[in-house]
Amino acid sequence: MNKTAIALLALLASSASLAATPWQKITQPVPGSAQSIGSFSNGCIVGADTLPIQSEHYQVMRTDQRRYFGHPDLVMFIQRLSSQVSNLGMGTVLIGDMGMPAGGRFNGGHASHQTGLDVDIFLQLPKTRWTSAQLLRPQALDLVSRDGKHVVSTLWKPEIFSLIKLAAQDKDVTRIFVNPAIKQQLCFDAGTDRDWLRKVRPWFQHRAHMHVRLRCPADSLECEDQPLPPPGDGCGAELQSWFEPPKPGTTKPEKKTPPPLPPSCQALLDEHVI
């Protein structure tokens, strides 16, 4: 499938969620041992943790949206990464969307982030902490040129390279989605230490943030992991294909209805949503 068709599918998956979803009616995590259920784009979570809003190492954006819930592994990853960044004097990590209290489908903005294992992190590391007003209405820093072929050299910083590398080297991380131009710059800058690049995957948009995805926890038996990324650093023909013009004759795919929920997620809704 060519890149344009994939983009349209992703857009449709996201737009399908614009209708109100019952998951927003669940305002607190569902009690129980932490269990990520289903797939990243069709699932839920029991026993989610709340990411502490106050931290000396990170700041949470758009707290009014209440998308700061996730599996305990995700909360620990954020704390671990932000502590590393702080100890290296790189700046403050800016945390975007994680998931809702019970996971599930959003009413817009995301097709995934449903099992408590995804987090968006801004690709900027301010040295001065943001104000409450800045956090509620964050200004994204677009690192990619207008033509999408490279990063903006005046905006690309070594600290951003290090932030992505630190995240990719974490044992629990299975994928990091960034814009193809950002992946390309990482390939240029990586030198001989390249194993971590395998986890960094080019994807549409993602011009100002990285989307970090964790592997399924070992004790979440109903969690569906993705296959591992292809072997290698992903800096060759696959990456270059993202910069090729779309093939003629690309047609818009038919709009698809969301798939049925995993039975455990449907049971959760039946119990907790009137």
Curated annotation (Swiss-Prot):
Disulfide bonds join C44-C265, C187-C235, C216-C223. Its cofactor is Zn(2+). Its EC number is 3.4.24.-. It holds the Pfam family Peptidase_M74. It is found in: Periplasm. It is an enzyme of class 3 (hydrolase). Keywords: Disulfide bond, Hydrolase, Metal-binding, Metalloprotease, Periplasm, Protease, Signal, Zinc. Zn(2+) 1 binds at H110, H113, D120, H211. Zn(2+) 2 binds at D147, H150. GO terms for molecular function: metal ion binding; metalloendopeptidase activity; serine-type endopeptidase activity. Binds 2 Zn(2+) ions per subunit. Zn(2+) ion 1 is bound in the active site. Zn(2+) ion 2 is bound at the dimer interface by residues from both subunits. Residues 227-274 are annotated as: Disordered. Residues 1-19 form the signal peptide. NCBIfam families: PRK09429.1. Belongs to the peptidase M74 family. This is Penicillin-insensitive murein endopeptidase.
